[in-house]
Amino acid sequence: MNLETIIGLEVHVELKTNSKIFSASPTEFGAEPNTQTSVIDLGYPGVLPTLNKEAVNFAMKAAMALNCEIATETKFDRKNYFYPDNPKAYQISQFDKPIGENGWIEIEVDGKKKRIGITRLHLEEDAGKSTHTADGSLVDYNRQGMPLIEIVSEPDMRTPEEAYAYLEKLKSIIQYTGVSDCKMEEGSLRCDANISLRPVGQEKFGTKAELKNLNSFTYVQKGLEHEQVRQEKELLSGGIIQQETRRYDEATKKTILMRVKEGSDDYRYFPEPDLVELYIDDAWKEEVRASIPELPDARKARYVAELGLPAYDAHVLTLTKEMSDFFEATVADGADAKLTSNWLMGEVLAYLNKQQKELKDVALTPAGLSKMVQLIEKGTISSKIAKKVFNELIEKGGDPEEIVKAKGLVQISDEGTLRKVVTEILDNNEQSIEDFKNGKDRAIGFLVGQIMKATKGQANPPLVNKILLEEINKR
């Protein structure tokens, strides 16, 4: 029996508002536990929620960027459940009238594009955060009442790789809109994955398992890969898949049962009595739509059409708004687009990945990178020398021209000076000349290496090659 994998994702995104969704409590990350909460967040008797309009605007903005239809009439509902991190014993969410529906985004895996549907996008409040220790459990209610959007995909993904690509694209779009920073390490983007298997050709879905506590896109992919294998083994051996919630354990690289999955009936949804229905007219929608900036796909197309970048470069540069904005500022300062792209995708990304940092954490600026790239273009420094300048720029900052002067890194492009060096090297390496004339091309590489060594890497490489061949042909 051949089985087909069905994957759908539920993504929670914390909105970057200054106050919480139903109270004036601040939303700063990293504050002392239980210092950013109020009687409204904690559900004290007699208090009433007040809807944060900015949260609604942000939700609409995200929904529009994800090609959703925006509701004209929407409302809030109570989702009833009891956990220690939920002091009210209910969560204010949206059940049957979400703010956005029927959206989609396009992903690309192995060169093939695919549209993934988005069932709905709705607003809700976040819960507190529980921390379990050997001595007991602690609860921080700072997160309680933070504004969230939940984005529910259609079950359109068929592989864990597609799920990864979907998350990467979704994160990129949301970051570009500016409604969230989408930092998984800070909990501002969280993902639950639903996966089931069914015989190829069957329309009815199989019984799904939900994977929770997936704190990176890589864990989402690995968790789905393991669950795919687990369910396949169970079904092929005649077993039955139970509807349950599981978590991915990185140590064992397996998914582990957490609990039997609840259905929506278990939450006893009913309309939130303390909030009126919300009506969104066309003028409000257009006001929000006008605030949406250029999104990654449009920016990618512009890089290819206007700047002449390869599609791959454009894709990598637009994955994050931070990198794309840095690229734009560097090119706007006069640097060549392709050369800038090469440095950002090469040395810059390699440094950031190795140091586990973001662009905002390093001393390199668009103006600094632009000046360095222009020095390469002018022939003042070679690409090899530029790496020494780059190391200084990204660690300490500064002016590339001043760094080049202070360290004596100016490229030697004077033909007379280089010809003297070449002549001296050839005089001391007659065997290499013979080897080259006898067809051993590697000999030229050796000679170039000796010249670069003699000039401390500062010789102009194209000019060295030209002079070297001229001098060899004279002998």
Curated annotation (Swiss-Prot):
Protein name according to UniProt: Aspartyl/glutamyl-tRNA(Asn/Gln) amidotransferase subunit B
Q: What Gene3D superfamilies does the database record attribute to this sequence?
A: 1.10.10.410, GatB domain, N-terminal subdomain (1.10.150.380)
Q: How does it assemble?
A: Heterotrimer of A, B and C subunits.
What family does this belong to? Belongs to the GatB/GatE family. GatB subfamily.
GO terms for biological process, alphabetical: glutaminyl-tRNAGln biosynthesis via transamidation; translation
Q: Which UniProt keywords apply?
A: ATP-binding, Ligase, Nucleotide-binding, Protein biosynthesis
Q: InterPro entries in the record, alphabetically?
A: Asn/Gln-tRNA_amidoTrfase_suB/E, Asn/Gln-tRNA_Trfase_suB/E_cat, Asn/Gln_amidotransferase, Asn/Gln_tRNA_amidoTrase-B-like, GatB, GatB_C_1, GatB_Yqey_C_2, Gln-tRNA_amidoTrfase_suB_CS
Catalyses which reaction(s): L-glutamyl-tRNA(Gln) + L-glutamine + ATP + H2O = L-glutaminyl-tRNA(Gln) + L-glutamate + ADP + phosphate + H(+); L-aspartyl-tRNA(Asn) + L-glutamine + ATP + H2O = L-asparaginyl-tRNA(Asn) + L-glutamate + ADP + phosphate + 2 H(+)
- Among its keywords, does the record have Ribosomal protein? no
Q: Which SUPFAM superfamilies match?
A: GatB/YqeY motif (SSF89095), Glutamine synthetase/guanido kinase (SSF55931)
Q: What is its EC number?
A: 6.3.5.-
Q: What class of enzyme is it?
A: ligase
Q: What job does this protein perform?
A: Allows the formation of correctly charged Asn-tRNA(Asn) or Gln-tRNA(Gln) through the transamidation of misacylated Asp-tRNA(Asn) or Glu-tRNA(Gln) in organisms which lack either or both of asparaginyl-tRNA or glutaminyl-tRNA synthetases. The reaction takes place in the presence of glutamine and ATP through an activated phospho-Asp-tRNA(Asn) or phospho-Glu-tRNA(Gln).
| Organism per entry | Bacillus thuringiensis subsp. konkukian (strain 97-27)
- Pfam families hit by this protein: GatB_N, GatB_Yqey
